């Protein structure tokens, strides 16, 4: 609820970052990150969006929505083998990571381990080559399917209609993926 968040932030916005789930897989609930993230950024709050189940299945404009960190996975709407993660990082998020006062406790949780890897020709662990080939094919499929988002929406609507037609109730009335 964007209005409720705005009312809350007017009273208390003394925190560094907020984590949001773009689309919750079990419920199908879709949070409007296009409104929530700019509101948080208005108060100087970094945004971390979990879009594992929505990335490439819902419209996403990372810069326009002012998202600092966007995380996705290969196994959902991308339709690639599981095992790969995607992270987009804003300049504000990089600045915050580089200015940490305490080190990241785990090598694998430290995104800065990947900083400059392409230029250095160094990857911080074993390269998942077969997964990358699968991802390349999945991205080719996405590129060659310009109506993908509309198709996802149409299928989702049909499934919800069938659920209601069968006499079941939807978990929520609106705001679903």
Where in this protein do the model-derived segments appear?
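Short, well-ordered, mixed-charge alpha-helical segments that flank or form enzyme active sites
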Residues: 1-2, 25-30, 55-59, 64, ...
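Active-site phosphate-binding strand-loop segment of PLP-dependent enzymes
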Residues: 2-51, 56, 69
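Fold-independent oxyanion-binding glycine-rich loops
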Residues: 20-24, 49-52, 58, 73-75, ...
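Short, structured coil segments at secondary-structure junctions
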Residues: 43, 65-66, 166
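Conserved active-site segment immediately N-terminal to the catalytic lysine
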Residues: 63-75
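Active-site C-terminal subdomain of aminotransferase-like
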Residues: 75-161
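Conserved PLP-binding catalytic core of the aspartate aminotransferase-like
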Residues: 169-177
């Amino acid at each position: 609820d964007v209005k409720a968040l705005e009312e809350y932030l007017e009273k208390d916005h003394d925190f560094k970052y907020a984590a949001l789930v773009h689309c919750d897989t079990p419920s199908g609930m879709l949070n409007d990150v296009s409104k929530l993230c700019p509101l948080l950024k208005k108060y100087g709050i970094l945004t971390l969006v979990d879009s594992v189940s929505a990335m490439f299945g819902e419209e996403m404009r990372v810069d326009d929505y002012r998202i600092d960190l966007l995380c996705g996975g290969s196994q959902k709407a991308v339709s690639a083998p599981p095992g790969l993660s995607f992270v987009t990082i804003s300049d504000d998020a990089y600045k915050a990571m580089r200015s940490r006062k305490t080190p990241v406790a785990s090598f694998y949780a430290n995104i800065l381990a990947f900083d400059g890897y392409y230029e250095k020709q160094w990857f911080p662990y074993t390269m998942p080559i077969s997964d990358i080939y699968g991802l390349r094919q999945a991205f080719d499929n996405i590129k060659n399917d310009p109506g993908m988002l509309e198709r996802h929406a149409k299928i989702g609507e049909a499934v919800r209609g069938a659920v209601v037609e069968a006499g079941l109730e939807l978990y929520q009335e609106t705001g679903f993926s």
